[in-house]
């Protein structure tokens, strides 16, 4: 009796398969749940491939996936293919100073886009990216550009200005 109930619960939750394609062209199949975090997925890749999570960058639909988010947050469904890029050098830290004087520390890569950086700020502070304006060396930073495009290096400080709705 107990067993059949458990079985039913598992069937209802239902896992799904996704594929992870590496730069060498190898495809790894993973069993996941929509509620799995990206961190969980990286742990599964480590189990299969022995690659430490901190060396993994996962890309889906051109976006780099953030550890704290879930597969369903990114609308990753069964049979979706993620791309795995290895992060060889360590990342770097940058600082983001808000108007209230608070300083946020972020782990980034020179190849991260401004959009990625805004997503990281959202994860830490809960501020939606469309309300964020980032300023560096007096310039407003464009979403599609990367940190290296602006010559933003480790320990650089960006300034965060909030864009109020409308206007």
UniProtKB/Swiss-Prot annotation:
Residues 1-15, 16-91, 92-167 form the Ubiquitin-like domain. GO terms for cellular component: cytoplasm; nucleus. Pfam families: ubiquitin (PF00240). CDD domains: Ubl_ubiquitin. The record marks 69, 87 as: Interacts with activating enzyme. There is a cross-link at residue 91 (Glycyl lysine isopeptide (Gly-Lys) (interchain with K-? in acceptor proteins)). The keyword rRNA-binding does not apply. InterPro entries: Ubiquitin-like_dom, Ubiquitin-like_domsf, Ubiquitin_CS, Ubiquitin_dom, Ubiquitin_ubiquitin-like. Belongs to the ubiquitin family. There is a cross-link at residues 21, 26, 42, 44, 48, 63, 78 (Glycyl lysine isopeptide (Lys-Gly) (interchain with G-Cter in ubiquitin)). It comes from the Eukaryota. Keywords: Cytoplasm, Isopeptide bond, Nucleus, Repeat, Ubl conjugation. Ubiquitin is synthesized as a polyubiquitin precursor with exact head to tail repeats, the number of repeats differ between species (up to 12 in Xenopus). In some species there is a final amino-acid after the last repeat. Some ubiquitin genes contain a single copy of ubiquitin fused to a ribosomal protein (either eL40 or eS31). For the sake of clarity sequence features are annotated only for the first chain, and are not repeated for each of the following chains. The lineage of its organism: Eukaryota, Metazoa, Chordata, Craniata, Vertebrata. The record marks 83 as: Essential for function. It is found in: Cytoplasm; Nucleus. Ubiquitin Exists either covalently attached to another protein, or free (unanchored). When covalently bound, it is conjugated to target proteins via an isopeptide bond either as a monomer (monoubiquitin), a polymer linked via different Lys residues of the ubiquitin (polyubiquitin chains) or a linear polymer linked via the initiator Met of the ubiquitin (linear polyubiquitin chains). This is Polyubiquitin.
């Amino acid at each position: 009796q107990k067993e059949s109930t458990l079985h039913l619960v598992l069937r209802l939750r239902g896992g799904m398969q996704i594929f992870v394609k590496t730069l060498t062209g190898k495809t790894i199949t993973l069993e996941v749940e929509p509620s799995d975090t990206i961190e969980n997925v990286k742990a599964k890749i480590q189990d299969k491939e022995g690659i430490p999570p901190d060396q993994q960058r996962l890309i889906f639909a051109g976006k780099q996936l953030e550890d704290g988010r879930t597969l369903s947050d990114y609308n990753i469904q069964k049979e979706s293919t993620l791309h795995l890029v290895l992060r060889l050098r360590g990342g770097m830290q940058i600082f983001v100073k808000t108007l209230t004087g608070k300083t946020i520390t972020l782990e980034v890569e020179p190849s991260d886009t401004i959009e990625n950086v805004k997503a990281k700020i959202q994860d830490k502070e809960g501020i939606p990216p469309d309300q964020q304006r980032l300023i560096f060396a007096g310039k407003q930073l464009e979403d599609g550009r990367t940190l290296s495009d602006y010559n933003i290096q480790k320990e650089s400080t960006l300034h965060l200005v909030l864009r109020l709705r409308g206007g």
